[in-house]
Amino acid sequence: MSVKELIVNAGSSSLKYTVFRMPEQEVLANGIFEQLTTPKPTFTHKLPNESGKLVKVIEKEPLAPYATHADAINTLIETLTGKKFGVLSSMDEIAAVGHRVLHGGEKFSGSVLVTESVKEAIRECIPLGPLHNPANLMGIEVCEKIMKGIP
């Protein structure tokens, strides 16, 4: 049985994402929010064409000045479930959200289910990845808040 997963890579001023159909590893959509929290953030969204090649359907779409990661996640949900460029009928189709975290220190070398203790361990590793780990953690927390109930 196929499931859909949303993979998120939250950076200090960006948010990259891909929606996969698993276990086929089929890319249903991907994109990036760039220059978040600046005067001119943008959004690019790609969908596969008939041959499966990803093509830009939204390119460098301006967002509200100083848009946050939470704003980006909300725009992402609207886009993924929208009639024009959506690939989901609702977020209920997402079985899980995966997050890229730069540095897990000696605590993590592979995938884990995010719990409060995992988030605390990511915080403890901030000295190992001071630019990325705070943003990665913030991405996890924003997704948890906005996409309640999705692991």
What are these regions (language model features)?
Residues 2-46:
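Gly/Thr-rich phosphate-binding beta-strand-loop-beta motif of the actin/hexokinase/Hsp70
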Residues 10-11, 100-101, 136:
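Fold-independent oxyanion-binding glycine-rich loops
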Residues 27-95:
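Contiguous, glycine/small-aliphatic-enriched amphipathic segments in soluble metabolic enzymes
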Residues 69, 80, 84-131:
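Short beta-strand-loop/turn "lid" adjacent to the catalytic site in phosphate-handling enzymes
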Residues 118, 122-151:
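Active-site neighborhood for divalent-cation/phosphate handling
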